[in-house]
């Protein structure tokens, strides 16, 4: 569905909210000169050239249009591609078909966070398997976080493909040894033998394997990345990243496509990050006991190294201190209720550690309770107290076998609780359990 206003045109679907209609800013594989060489080119001109030419329109319908469950619980919604997703998939397929060597067939996709990389990866799967020359490829997804793995699996359902989960090292080896054209999902740490000294084996020499690595900048510069390349030496590797660093290009080659933060903000896909400095006056209690404990643990360490350790761990201890967190939590609640909550928005707090996250929950709840009592006596700004009283604070942290269960309660590390809280957080107020702060 296309909406127009004067010279501006945007693409969406019958289920799209207005904010999800987007301009089509690149007519790829055409250039602007294909539209006109002697007149001003409008937004409408670019969209018509980029989406309504016969080949592009058919591809948008067959490859790029998806049906997914509405995260707001409103049933099934229809999703149209954004121009950078269409362009990237086309470039990946072109490179895979035209490159001479595996390194020439792969490369880096730099798409900023929140721009739909998971959908782009699944649209690539569709495009590969619809191409007669490439339909025999095995496609391997590699990620380094369970959240990303789950996101890719959920996205795969929307395109009608089943992903084989390499839930163990041995299962991974079995799946990669075959030349069957299927989808395999693996966490990067599966590319490591249980015994550190043991080398990871060569598993498949086929050049009909496409490896797509999500958030590649985080994982590919150590032995695990080397093992991946050793296991599949002739595979084509496409690295997706939202925050590229120098080593990404050194490892995976040149860029296939770029979609930067600035472009994303200009397109309204992501919001601009605004930084506001805050100060507080909290002081640590029992400093003498803290220093004594430090000396007890590090008494045998040389003075220079001790200073380095003290600088690193004193700062972390400071950020985890209950007094500091309580002071910050009070300031956060004050700012949130004054500037954010009245606009219907929720809030996220990123902590320095899991311990700090758990402590923030307690202190935010305390600060919220105090603020509500204050507003019950004096509510000159007419804050919605009924909704505010339902507001909940949730903790989302990962578990560890070494956890102190008294500190990290099961509910804090339980994936089912995580999913429930995240779903609630994504819903607007009035349509959820009112998880307002994560």
Descriptions of predicted regions:
Residues 2-4, 184-187, 211, 236-241:
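Structural recognition of the conserved hydrophobic beta-strand(s) that form the central parallel beta-sheet
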Residues 183-213, 218-227, 435-438:
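Conserved RecA-like ASCE ATPase "motif II neighborhood" in helicase/translocase motors
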Residues 1-138, 147-162, 179-180, 189, ...:
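ATP-dependent helicase/translocase motor core
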Residues 100-105, 134-135, 177-180, 196-209, ...:
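Short basic/glycine-enriched coil/helix segment immediately N-terminal to the Walker B
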Residues 157-196:
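Inter-Walker segment of RecA-like/P-loop motor cores
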Residues 249-345, 360-377:
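Interdomain helical connector at the RecA1-RecA2 junction of SF1/SF2 helicase-like NTPases
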Residues 113, 215-219, 231-248:
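Conserved helicase ATPase motor motifs in RecA-like P-loop NTPase domains
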Residues 312-437:
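Conserved C-terminal RecA-like helicase domain
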């Amino acid at each position: 569905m296309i909406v127009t206003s004067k010279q501006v045109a945007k693409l969406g679907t019958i289920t799209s909210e207005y904010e999800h209609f987007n301009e089509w800013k690149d007519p790829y594989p055409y250039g602007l000169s294909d539209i006109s060489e002697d007149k001003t080119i409008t937004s409408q001109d670019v969209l018509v050239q980029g989406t309504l030419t016969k080949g592009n329109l058919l591809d948008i319908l067959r490859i790029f249009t998806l049906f997914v469950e509405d995260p707001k619980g409103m049933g099934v919604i229809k999703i149209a591609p954004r121009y950078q997703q269409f362009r990237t998939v086309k470039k990946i397929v072109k490179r895979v078909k035209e490159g001479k060597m595996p390194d020439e067939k792969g490369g880096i996709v730099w798409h900023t966070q929140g721009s739909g990389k998971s959908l782009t990866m699944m649209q690539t799967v569709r495009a590969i398997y619809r191409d007669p020359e490439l339909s025999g490829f095995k496609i391997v997804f590699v990620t380094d976080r369970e959240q990303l793995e789950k996101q890719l699996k959920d996205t795969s359902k929307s395109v009608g493909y089943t992903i084989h989960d390499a839930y163990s090292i041995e299962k991974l080896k079995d799946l990669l040894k075959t030349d069957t054209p299927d989808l395999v999902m693996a966490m990067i740490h599966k590319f490591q033998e249980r015994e550190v000294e043991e080398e990871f084996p060569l598993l498949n020499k086929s050049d009909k394997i496409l490896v797509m690595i999500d958030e590649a900048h985080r994982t590919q510069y150590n032995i695990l990345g080397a093992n991946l390349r050793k296991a599949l030496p002739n595979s084509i590797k496409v690295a997706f990243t939202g925050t590229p660093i120098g080593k990404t290009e050194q490892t995976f080659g040149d860029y296939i496509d770029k979609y930067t933060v600035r472009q994303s903000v200009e397109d309204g896909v992501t919001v601009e990050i605004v930084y506001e400095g805050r100060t507080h006056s909290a002081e640590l209690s029992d400093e003498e006991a803290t220093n004594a404990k430090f000396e007890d643990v590090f008494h045998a360490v040389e003075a220079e190294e001790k200073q380095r350790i003290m600088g690193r761990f004193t700062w972390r201890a400071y950020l985890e201190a209950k007094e500091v967190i309580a002071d910050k939590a009070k300031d956060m609640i004050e700012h949130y209720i004054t500037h954010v909550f009245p606009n219907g928005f929720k809030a996220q707090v990123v902590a320095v550690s899991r311990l700090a996250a758990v402590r923030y929950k307690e202190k935010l709840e305390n600060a919220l309770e105090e603020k509500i009592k204050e507003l019950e006596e004096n509510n000159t700004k007419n804050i919605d107290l009924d909704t505010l009283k339902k507001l909940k604070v949730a903790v989302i942290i990962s578990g560890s076998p070494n956890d102190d269960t008294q500190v990290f309660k099961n509910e804090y590390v339980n994936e089912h609780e995580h999913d429930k809280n995240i779903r609630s957080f994504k819903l607007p107020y009035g349509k959820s359990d009112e998880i307002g702060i994560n």
